[in-house]
Amino acid sequence: MNPLLTIVIPVLNEAPILSERLEALQFVRCRGVELIVVDGGSTDDSFDIASARSDHTLKAAAGRAKQMNEGARHANGEWLLFLHADTRLGEEAFDALLEALSGESDWGWFDVHIEGKHPLLLVTAAMMNARAGLTKVATGDQGLFMKKALFDAVGGFPDMPLMEDVALSKALRGIAKSKVVRTPLVTDGRRWDQGGWLRTVLKMWGLRFAYWAGVGPDRLADYYAHVRGR
């Protein structure tokens, strides 16, 4: 019998955190969830680490959209949950997800808590959660989940280097009922800690505004790579 849920995790050179994160997810496998990790060409030990701690470990071209689509293609679950490697799904959040899957909605996302050093990360998370609730557009940090049949019907994630999560949310919100799981995922605040809180927030807002203004994803990706390299 096929599982109710498949979790798909795209990774690229995540060896320093991957073992701990996958070990923390073993409880879902004990509860019948299929766990798929898709490696985008890591040069560290990510693939081997994932192989020992997942049901399927796949290889794909680098890029979250490509990797997540590849994972979904091999998934056997009725539902899909796309989870970033630096985001934790605790048991309470998992139980809340199962409750959501038994409802009338066809897709949704979680509220998020950002774990980091800066006190304003609480405000950042609150703003992310409020924005998603208002616009019904969620980001990958918020753990997008949906029926596999719905994911296939809209063609999966658009093949974009950035904003693939936003684009998929926009496609789904117009055709299916959504659900917000209020028990939060916990995501790593390392990008805010390393890049500086204000600079990182301004960069993310700038990217989102440019996307909404019609700037193409390839140009956005070039800009993102440029500012990350500073």
Whereabouts are the PLM-identified features?
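Conserved donor nucleotide-binding strand/loop of the catalytic core
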Residues: 33-36, 47-76
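Short beta-strand/loop segment that forms part of the nucleotide-sugar
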Residues: 23-26, 32-41, 58
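Acidic helix N-cap motif at the loop->helix transition within catalytic regions
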Residues: 16-20, 44-52, 92
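A conserved acidic beta->alpha catalytic loop
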Residues: 39-47, 87
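Hydrophobic helical membrane-anchoring modules
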Residues: 1, 170-230
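Conserved donor NDP-sugar-binding/catalytic core segment of glycosyltransferases
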Residues: 91-120
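Short aromatic/hydrophobic "clamp" motif used to bind/position activated sugar donors
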Residues: 80
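Short, well-formed alpha-helical segments that are part of the catalytic scaffolds
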Residues: 13-27
